[in-house]
Amino acid sequence: MVPVYLAAMPGSPAPDAAGPPALAVVGAAVFDGGGGPPLPGRTVVAAGGVIERVGPVGRTVPPAGAVVVDGAGATLLPGFVDAHVHLDCYPPAQVLAGGVTTVRDLGWPAERLAALGARAAAPGAASPRLLAAGQIVTVPGGYPTRAPWAPPGTARPVDGPAEAAAAVAELAEAGAAVIKVALDDRVGPTLPAPVLAAIVEAAVERGLGVTAHVGTAAEAAKALAVGVGELAHWPFDPRPLPDPLVDALAEAVVAVPTLHIDPSPARRAGVRRFVARGGRVVYGTDLGNQGPPPAVDTEELRLLVEAGLPPAQALAAATSLAAAHLGLAGTGRVVAGARADLLLVDGDPLADLAALSRVRLVTRDGWVAANSGRQGGATPPVP
């Protein structure tokens, strides 16, 4: 019996009459996740776990009985989407309370992910929404079979194309949202190109993408050649990647840079070149590794801005763009009809990323996960 850690990809949001009570955030500036400037003086109303209305304070009245939260002096954003975590390294409730409402786990034992997934799927769960890759596909003796951070069962060694395709089928049956492969020639053998190609083919047959942990430029080129569509990190190669490779990566892959865990000059410059060539970037932190906090990682965002993303685009990479990349319809926006995944912070994060650490309110599907106490109480019924 294969442990199932994600029963199904969450579909488009729909109001749940038995869900959380109506909620209204009044008077906040709203960054809606689309990459534009915040809209000042807005009221956002959510009911049944879905955003119902977003409008100017004077023309948007909270419904009777709604819990009203004071948004004065604050910015309301979509809850963050972290595309690279190892969730079991921290209490999920702590991650959620820090403003991260959706995560994608990129490598952990199936049995432990099954327990995390069951908790995350419960209504009102004190956990981010969880998508997962499951085990990391590698070769015998390859990364991360001997990595000190990886519990037994994190790696899925395969020997040959047939065994690789069977591993993909098993991971897909368990509910994998993506297939992760390890190509780290700095620490051991790596998947040969024919085996890697078999993994990509088997994943595509099941509607899944492939993300790669790559150590060097050579492994990035190998991944690119067989159709891997995502880098789970920017390569750790201390040498600059050749220009033709950066050009090709910018054309063909999405990068989850994870710069905070290793902000070496070569990696920072590489992401800067990738962005300058129009490469697509999605926010991910490698939570569980050294550096990233169990919350919004403002240092990762700062490094993305340093790499050339305007602040609004960096925030979009952590909200709407990340959600779209993960296939989550109706997530990562503060607009009518979207999931009520909300993050209210003191100040303006576009002017000062540190504002993202000053959390006033977090909701996931409309359920309150963190509240600093600036609450106006329930709106009285209209006579």
Go through each PLM region and give its residues.
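N-terminal metal-binding scaffold of metallo-dependent hydrolase/deaminase domains
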Residues: 1-63, 347-352, 367-368
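C-terminal cap of metal-dependent C-N hydrolases
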Residues: 318, 336-380
